[in-house]
Curated annotation (Swiss-Prot):
Keyword annotations: Methylation, Ribonucleoprotein, Ribosomal protein, RNA-binding, rRNA-binding
Family indicated by similarity: Belongs to the universal ribosomal protein uL11 family.
Protein's name according to its UniProt entry: Large ribosomal subunit protein uL11
UniProt-listed PROSITE patterns: RIBOSOMAL_L11
InterPro entries per record: Ribosomal_uL11, Ribosomal_uL11_bac-typ, Ribosomal_uL11_C, Ribosomal_uL11_C_sf, Ribosomal_uL11_CS, Ribosomal_uL11_N, Ribosomal_uL11_N_sf
Species of provenance: Shewanella baltica (strain OS185)
NCBIfam families: L11_bact
Length: 142
């Protein structure tokens, strides 16, 4: 018989640097999960990724206080900022543009995020990423 699911916890944790401090500790502690066990497992799974990259993680907590977790790809905004070499997006994206990004790079990001996105096809996912780029003040060039 399958274990009874007690809760789902969604967090964004930097790759390779999960530790018991907030937000990880309090979120897992109130559900009775072994925090250090999660931190060690998460850091082991993300050790090959770029250090400090924000990784969305969904933790499934079971009634016996055991857990499983699933990592997702980094947020599109983070991937766009690193691809364009920016520190942050534009505070006024409609009037103040902060950089440019090639359409080929946007499509590459869409293909990377395809597993986590619910788009019908790669073109739709690419358009979605282009919209995110525009809302950050990036100009998408051919």
């Amino acid at each position: 018989m399958a274990k009874k699911i007690d809760a789902y916890i969604k967090l964004q944790v930097k790759s390779g640097s999960a530790n018991p401090s907030p937000p990880v500790g309090p979120a897992l502690g109130q559900k009775g999960v072994n925090i250090m066990e999660f931190c060690k497992a998460f850091n082991a799974r993300t050790e090959k990724m770029e250090k400090g990259m924000p990784i969305p993680v969904v933790i499934t907590v079971y009634s016996d206080r055991s857990f499983t977790f699933e990592t997702k790809t980094s947020p599109a905004s983070y991937l766009l900022k690193t691809a364009a070499g920016l520190k942050s997006g534009s505070p006024r994206p409609n009037t103040q543009k902060v950089g440019t990004i090639a359409r080929a790079k946007v499509q590459e990001i869409a293909e990377l995020k395809a597993a986590d996105m619910t788009g019908a096809d790669i073109e739709a996912m690419t358009r979605s990423i282009e919209g995110t780029a525009r809302s950050m003040g990036l100009v998408v060039e051919d």
